[in-house]
Amino acid sequence: MIGNIYQIEGGYTAQRVGERNLQAVSTVADALPMLLAGAPDITDIETLLEVVDGVLLTGARPNVHPSYFGTEPHPSHEPYDENRDAVARKLTRACIDRGIPAFGVCRGFQERCVAFGSSLHPENRDLPRRIHYRVPRLESGERHPYSEVVFADRHGINLLPGAFLISYLAVRQFAPRSRRCRLRG
């Protein structure tokens, strides 16, 4: 799991990972969750991959920097986390080269796609006929406090016959808990 950079009180930069991700790795994967620094100057990916059985690229608020998929940055699409971008890109490719499973959730899925040449739409709010995936808010404008509301099913997905996921999920339809999706190409 790669840390997500954020500012704490006093302006100090910190890295964190969501409790839901830690619990999923521990209980569902029966594995020991480890936080990987989203800082390329202190992250030794080769050494890390000698001791892990898999990698989870988690979600995060910052967007993948558009320079990775041939689009110009724009202030309305910020924030970006170029340090995490650099670590995730190198880590994703190294996992594939070594045959180590690397699963992506939310931004992590976007990082995997971009690492292998796909592009993203920089902001799905700009797309016609989009589905709104943002975090539910209270009437006051504050983020909804209950995770079962924030991560509730949002829409259905129908897999095409022969889709790769059918062999793993054993279903052709399901409702993911997605909040944003910008993949294209």
Question: How would you name each of these model-derived features?
Answer:
Residues 1-103, 114, 118-121, 125-170, ...:
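N-terminal beta1-alpha1 cap of cysteine-dependent amidohydrolase-like domains
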